[in-house]
Amino acid sequence: MSLEIVPFVVAIPARFSASRLPGKPLRLLGGRPLIHRVAERALSAGAREVWVATDDVRIAEAVASLDGVHVAITANTHLSGSDRLAECARIAGWDPEVCVVNLQGDEPFAPAAGIRAVAALLHHSNADMATLATTIDKSEDLFNPNIVKLVCNAHGEALYFSRAPIPWNRDTFATTREPTPLGPWLRHIGLYACNAGFLQRFTTMQPGTLEQIESLEQLRVLEAGHRIAVRITPEHFPPGIDTPEDLAKAEKALEDV
C-alpha cells in the first residue's frame, strides 16, 4: 500500500535510567551518542520539527549540539514515553490536530520511509493511533521477550501486543520452536503516530493491568477502548537497542556497512 506524505513532527522520549541499559541515549554507537543517530533519522524523514523530550540535563546538553533539534525538559515522574511526549507537546505548543510521530530513542536505524509511512497511516485511518510491524522469521526473535509481538484483526487494527510469542501454535510448538508460514508472526516496531490532542487524552487514562504486566504502554490505549492502526511495512527495521548485546550487534552492523 502506497501512502502519500503528510506533514508531521517527531518527538523522541529519552531517559537516562533505562533498567536494561543505563545511560542508553548517551551510549556510543559508531563513536556518536545513540540519541544523535535517532534524531538524525527523524530529520532525514522530513519532519517539520524534531524534539527530544528528556528529564536529564546530560541528554539535553548532548542534543543541544544538533542543528534543527529542539529539547523539552520534562518531569521525571512520567510512567511512559507517551506521557513524557504529552508534556513535550504542551511545551512545543502544538495544536491538537498536529500529527506527532513518537520515535523511540533506541531506534537508530529507523528508515525515513517508515517514519513517513506511520504518519500517513494515521492520516488515512479512523484509528486514534498508528504503528508499524514487520514479519518474524527467526525463532530467536519470536521467543525473545525484548521483541514485542502483536496480532491484528481483519481491518488492520491491533488486537493485542505481548512479549510472549503470539499467536501460540499449539500443535507446531509442541515439537518445534521454529516459526511456520501459518502465522505470520509480527514484530512490533517502536514507532507510533497520533495527534497532539490524543497525547493529552492518553495522560488521563489509567495504566491498566495488561500494561503493568507486559510493561507495554500501547496496551493502555487498547484497554481504554481506542483503536491502533497497523501497517506491515516492507522497509527493513533492525531491532531496537535494549541491552548491551543489542548495542554490540548494532556496532557490528555499522562496521559491516
Curated annotation (Swiss-Prot):
Protein origin, superkingdom: Bacteria
GO molecular function: 3-deoxy-manno-octulosonate cytidylyltransferase activity
Known catalytic reactions: 3-deoxy-alpha-D-manno-oct-2-ulosonate + CTP = CMP-3-deoxy-beta-D-manno-octulosonate + diphosphate
UniProt KW keywords: Cytoplasm, Lipopolysaccharide biosynthesis, Nucleotidyltransferase, Transferase
SUPFAM superfamilies (UniProt xref): Nucleotide-diphospho-sugar transferases
Broadest EC class assigned to this enzyme: transferase
CDD domains hit by this protein: CMP-KDO-Synthetase
Leader sequence segment: none
GO terms for cellular component: cytosol
Location relative to the cell: Cytoplasm
GO biological process: CMP-keto-3-deoxy-D-manno-octulosonic acid biosynthetic process; lipopolysaccharide biosynthetic process
Pfam families noted in UniProt: CTP_transf_3 (PF02348)
EC number: 2.7.7.38
Pathway assigned to this chain's UniProt record: Nucleotide-sugar biosynthesis; CMP-3-deoxy-D-manno-octulosonate biosynthesis; CMP-3-deoxy-D-manno-octulosonate from 3-deoxy-D-manno-octulosonate and CTP: step 1/1; Bacterial outer membrane biogenesis; lipopolysaccharide biosynthesis
NCBIfam families in the cross-refs: kdsB, PRK05450.1-5
Family affiliation: Belongs to the KdsB family.
Physiological role: Activates KDO (a required 8-carbon sugar) for incorporation into bacterial lipopolysaccharide in Gram-negative bacteria.
Protein name per the record: 3-deoxy-manno-octulosonate cytidylyltransferase
Source taxonomy: Bacteria, Pseudomonadati, Pseudomonadota, Gammaproteobacteria, Lysobacterales
Gene: kdsB
